[in-house]
Amino acid sequence: MTHASLEATTHRSDGTARIELRGDIDGSAGGALGAAYGETAGADSVLLDFGAVDYINSTGIALIVGILARARADARPVAARGLSEHYREIFEITRLSDFMTILADEQSPPRDEEGEPE
């Protein structure tokens, strides 16, 4: 199975920095994920958008824990959206959901054709 390298793009809106994640979150994703979080400096909150993530392994979970730790140190709440049912369950089992708000798809703001919030 071929895995797609993670692409992480940061967008800002109304005090929230949204990190749009695309591809696989595994050991190779550390640089992209860390750099994207670095771009959230000054935001009131962080939204991790998993809508285009295909795969997360245990190392990827550890990288997400690292982002949660950085956000906690920065006193910024983190939310996640776009998780498949499978990864929603994984986040509950690993207790990641205890440290971030998991948004249902209905709670996600509507997007335009480019994927930006309307």
PLM features per residue range, with description:
Residues 1-55, 66-118:
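STAS-like cytosolic regulatory interaction modules
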